[in-house]
Amino acid sequence: MAGHLVNYGKHRTRRSYARIKEVLDLPNLIKIQTNSYQWFLDEGLKEMFDDIMPIDDFQGKLSLEFVGYQLLEPKYTVEEARQHDANYSAPLHVTLRLTNHETGEIKSQDVFFGDFPLMTKQGTFIINGAERVIVSQLVRSPGVYFHSETDKNSRVTYGTTVIPNRGAWLEYETDAKDIAYVRIDRTRKIPLTELVRALGFGSDQDIINMFGDNDSLMLTLEKDVHKNTDDSRTDEALKDIYERLRPGEPKTADSSRSLLYARFFDPKRYDLASVGRYKVNKKLSLKTRLLNQVLAETLADPDTGEVIAQKGTKVDRQVMDKLAPYLDRDDFKTITYQPSDQGVVTDPIELQSIKVYSQVTPDKEINLIGNGHIGKKVKHIVPADVLASMNYFLNLQEGLGSIDDIDHLGNRRIRSVGELLQNQFRIGLSRMERVVRERMSIQDTATVTPQQLINIRPVVASIKEFFGSSQLSQFMDQTNPLGELTHKRRLSALGPGGLTRDRAGYEVRDVHYTHYGRMCPIETPEGPNIGLINSLASYAVVNPYGFIETPYRRVSWDTHKVTDKIDYLTADEEDNYIVAQANSPLNDDGSFVDETVLARHKDNNIEISPDKVDYMDVSPKQVVAVATACIPFLENDDSNRALMGANMQRQAVPLVNPHAPLVGTGMEYKAAHDSGTAVLANNAGTVEYVDAKQIRVRREDGALDAYNLMKFKRSNAGKNYNQRPIVTIGDHVDVDEIIADGPAMQNGELALGQNPIIAFMTWNMYNYEDAIVLSERLVKDDVYTSIHIEEYESEARDTKLGPEEVTREIPNVGEEALKDLDEFGVVRVGAEVRDGDILVGKVTPKGVTELSAEERLLHAIFGEKAREVRDTSLRVPHGGGGIIQDVKIFTREAGDELSPGVNMMVRVYITQKRKIQVGDKMAGRHGNKGTVSVVVPEEDMPYLPDGTPVDICLSPMGVPSRMNIGQVLELHLGMAARNLGIHVATPVFDGANDKDLWATVKEAGMASDGKSVLYDGRTGEPFENRVSVGIMYYMKLSHMVDDKIHARSIGPYSLVTQQPLGGKAQFGGQRFGEMEVWALEAYGAAYTLQEILTYKSDDVVGRVKTYEAIVKGEPIPKPGVPESFRVLVKELQALGLDMKVLGADKKEIELRDMDDDEDDIVSVDALAKFAAQQEEKKAHEAAAQATDGKSANSTDDKK
């Protein structure tokens, strides 16, 4: 037997064809969300308050300090928040201390800081009753970046950018003449030496002493206007810089000093963040820069004088291991520079300097300047960083140092929920800080309390804005559990502070070698967002700095055996090592079998001897994301189709009777477990009670845990979310075990579709162009039936003319239409409703004119009933019919929170049971998608020799050109699994190979080619050729024809052009565009064309008359002028063109009955006459219509 048995949970055993043993379990798949939010609560919030506080007033009399904070119990549970359209949030209370420095008095107080949204266990937020996900953002990391460009003359110019987390950018660049310039915050260029002078090194000699003899530097000094003077020229340089930054303002050295200090060295204005400091130190420290350089001086121990490395030594890994402890010391090769008193910063600057030989001219000595030992706590840039980065930049021309690749994942980092929230909170707090300062100067210092100073509105507003309208706060995709899980693991390069679709080029979107094990190379949307939205790879984790790490098995450096020790490496760290693939064959002791091993180093695939290998992949599926890892035989599919397969699995509709795939990958259990839709046991124990709505587990300590199951709830996508127990009374359950399946799950595994019998054959051309032929059995047996729940709501508001009323008594509505309404006018649960039926009867007061004496008398006698009301009932929209599943009524009397002006709100849930039908979209897991073209009676479908009819016929033409051969392999293995009565797992890149496949096919007693003779269901004759028949997992996707089919009768029109609106949502018409007009012109179908462009579109008068003519059975009148023509005339007149319309007799035609031309100002008499004519006309029409009451009613209604 090929393969071995593996248990997935307690309810499923699969035969697995994996050969590689799993040394590491998959991490919790939503950890990226939950860990980040937990960090925010534990540390992020406190960091924010510590940053902003203490707040001092302008005179220094008062000081407001932060003491601590606590989150109290949430007002609603998760379920209550959903029902009440509220937020799942907890009140945040902050303890503040106000110190009065004049009197020494200290006041402490608890201040309420608003309700703070909490994350649910599933990694989501409930905002206004809807579940939302905060997507992690992929951004450029703060740090120092070096880049080069080659111009058309093949000259290489270099550039440097210092990117902070927030603050001004600092850029260096060389021009075509090799002169070095600096730009501050994208302004005009300044010679590099001017910035050095401004930092307090005013004379040329100071600069040359520090940086050494560099060609570019010398050329820059030549260009510098303050050259050839021995005395310091700091002030002049400062004035020059100020003039460039603030042109037109009076320049003084003092204002320039304070400006530069504020731009770069003020921690409140400039922030590198801890990750920026880490990256800057890593890039500029001599530890990384000395590697592979040749020393131009002998290095000795400062204490003993013992030589560590001789002059002329090349610094390789071994030499660096000896040097490293010394480079970490403060007293090793450290030079202290004292800037002049006129400089921006006057503190001594410590730099580490070592001489090495140039790579370009080997005997030339070059100063390598490191930024000294700057602690992790220094979050802003310091002069040492500026000087060391300049040195790195100048040394690039000598061949020292390396160019950065900005698409390398060592230079891109993840901002998860916690950090995004923290940034938003900072915005709110800094706005609040301004208010506090102002209030401190206004309030009486003797009596003021912290509560009086604080205004929490900006803080609350910024958090609300973030959750409500940020590009990264998204309505959760709840089509199925895989869609949920993927949404929580999504990485977006878009959003505030990220890229925009239009500016993103190919490089950013492309797959980079550092994506390996960190980001999925396959799962990304098709279309404008391709490559900008990615998915976290299955084993990847995010480190505290926000860089993605992936696990590797360590290879022992002395025995060269692969150990089970796991190291998580960032992309930067991985660049230093050689990594073998997970499928490299190993002996039992962990040594490599082969004499050469296929391995990776940076972007090279190399064959190398095993003793050079440092690490080995943990698992073959560490390359791909969760959805991609659910595709069996992924290695046999073309990447474009695999992309579609991964994306379409997220769109599968949860079915009424889900079945897990016969051919799985072993990923189904983990995906379902971590998705958050299943019910997991919180504690171990024994099941005491089970029914459809509740499971009770007796814990080992004697306490009882009760789990309430979700029954027929509407998901965000309008699908049915339902949970069903999979345990029975007496079962023992472990912690974290699945005790109830969620939607699209079976026995704790993901079950997105079904396992039908599929044949690759044509059937009467019905499966031309990816169409699908279905057997009626799939309809009859509810194989692909799904439940959809739609929510409708109606509000009764206060209007200017009185309150709206929910009632049964609706004007002009017969008893038949009210049969399902209760005494209050709300539809009953269980009623079957069709399009246009009333769900909530509601009337709104009409505008009442001044009443006459008689009417007032009637009012007094009969009360309110005589008042005019109009029908504003909630009705079932087109295609929305079904069965009323639930009705919820919210009123102020019952204590529900309603919006202002709303007295009552009714919510109605309608359930539809949708069977598969012609027009529905279906797909397999290999990107093999299609739409149903015909449903054939079971008896007419082709059948197998044993009489079993085939369920689905797919076109064989869908395979060769698309190169997704995985579907054919799945088909054969699926048939073998069905015949053997087993489920199989074939993990990605480590699944069944052709030997395993044919061995299993043989074991199942199938033909050696995997094909079968098929018989025509209509004639009973065998088909000419043998056909590939088998079991393939096939899903119904959420693009159903019921949601798309649409027809318009008379509907809304656009206000200006008077043409029908477009789209199903607006009950719009079909667009008849330019090319369609050409088609009718080519046919010579003049009358058809005329009526399309007039009656059916924007001939306002004509369409009313046409309607009347149709109702009365009269001939259709001649068409009039389309409204859009009049719009065109008016637009041309608005441009100042005197546009007139002439008839055949060259006389001007008036486009309106009355034109408001200046020559033709209409008199009051003329208006009165016109009104009288109109009244008369109406009276005539009314008389004519009275003859036929029925038609009059219908005309009125439509009008």
From Swiss-Prot:
Name the source organism.
Lacticaseibacillus casei (strain BL23)
Tell me which domain of life the UniProt entry assigns to the organism this sequence originates from.
Answer: Bacteria
Q: Which InterPro entries match?
A: DNA-dir_RNA_pol_bsu_ext_1_sf, DNA-dir_RNA_pol_bsu_external_1, DNA-dir_RNA_pol_su2, DNA-dir_RNAP_su2_dom, DNA-dir_RNAP_su2_hyb_sf, RNA_pol_bsu_bac, RNA_pol_bsu_CS, RNA_pol_bsu_protrusion
Known role: DNA-dependent RNA polymerase catalyzes the transcription of DNA into RNA using the four ribonucleoside triphosphates as substrates.
* Enzyme class, broadest EC rank: transferase
Region (Disordered) location:
1175-1199
Nucleotidyltransferase as UniProt keyword:
yes
Q: What is its EC number?
A: 2.7.7.6
Q: Where is the composition biased (Polar residues)?
A: 1188-1199
Kindly list the GO molecular function terms attached to this UniProt entry: DNA binding; DNA-directed RNA polymerase activity; ribonucleoside binding
Q: Which reaction does it catalyse?
A: RNA(n) + a ribonucleoside 5'-triphosphate = RNA(n+1) + diphosphate
One GO cellular component from the entry?
DNA-directed RNA polymerase complex
Q: Would you identify the family this protein belongs to, as annotated?
A: Belongs to the RNA polymerase beta chain family.
Q: Where is the signal peptide?
A: none
Q: Is Nucleotidyltransferase among this UniProt entry's keywords?
A: yes
Question: SUPFAM superfamilies, alphabetically?
Answer: beta and beta-prime subunits of DNA dependent RNA-polymerase
A Pfam family: RNA_pol_Rpb2_6
An example of a Gene Ontology BP annotation on this entry?
Answer: DNA-templated transcription
Name this protein carries in UniProt: DNA-directed RNA polymerase subunit beta
Tell me how this protein assembles. The RNAP catalytic core consists of 2 alpha, 1 beta, 1 beta' and 1 omega subunit. When a sigma factor is associated with the core the holoenzyme is formed, which can initiate transcription.
* Keyword field: DNA-directed RNA polymerase, Nucleotidyltransferase, Transcription, Transferase
UniProt-listed PANTHER family: DNA-DIRECTED RNA POLYMERASE I SUBUNIT 2
